[in-house]
């Protein structure tokens, strides 16, 4: 599944991944279903979309949304997009018409970045850490942060999203002791 694996569930904490082996198709199949890719390649027939073009576009999209870790320390997306029941999503949509959600087989996946932004955390800092000003889902270290700082911010964001929406955010990075 997208951004998930057995190492985040049944084998969590049992292994440290030090290498991988890939089996690649000789005939590429480009998946451009992600919104910005779909829009960018909409004018082309599917068989004219090359892996190199998709790669270049993915890099451009990521650079426009995410801070460069070499410039501003971060771990990328810090919270998973929560999945709620269809009923809960409909209830939230009545109160928050701009709610961003995507139907899934198991319910509705909500955009955690949108929830965090609406809870007032986009671009906001708590000491040396904060949520990125361009992408509210990304927790950044402005310099000198400790794990205590990171966890305090994560807890505050989680609390505020829960209080505003009644939705729990799950941390995505796995922390090592």
Question: Which residue ranges define each predicted feature?
Answer:
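Phosphate/pyrophosphate- and phosphate-bearing ligand-binding catalytic cores of soluble enzymes
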Residues: 1-140, 144-148, 164, 168-177
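Conserved ATP-binding N-box helix of the HATPase_c
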Residues: 161
């Amino acid at each position: 599944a997208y951004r998930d694996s057995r190492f985040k569930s049944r084998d969590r904490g049992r292994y440290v991944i030090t290498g991988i082996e890939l089996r690649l198709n000789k005939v590429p199949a480009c998946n451009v279903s992600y919104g910005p890719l779909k829009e960018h390649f909409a004018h082309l027939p599917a068989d004219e979309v090359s892996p190199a073009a998709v790669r270049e576009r993915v890099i451009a999209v990521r650079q426009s949304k995410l801070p460069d870790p070499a410039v501003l320390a971060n771990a990328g997306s810090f919270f998973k997009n929560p999945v709620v029941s269809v009923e809960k999503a409909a209830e939230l949509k009545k109160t928050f018409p701009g709610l961003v959600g995507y139907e899934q087989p198991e319910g509705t996946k909500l955009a955690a970045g949108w929830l965090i932004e609406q809870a007032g955390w986009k671009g906001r800092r708590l000491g040396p850490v904060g949520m990125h000003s361009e992408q509210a889902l990304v927790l950044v270290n402005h310099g000198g942060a400790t794990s205590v700082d990171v966890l305090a911010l994560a807890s505050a964001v989680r609390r505020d999203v829960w209080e505003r929406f009644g939705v729990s955010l799950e941390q995505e990075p796995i922390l090592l002791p």
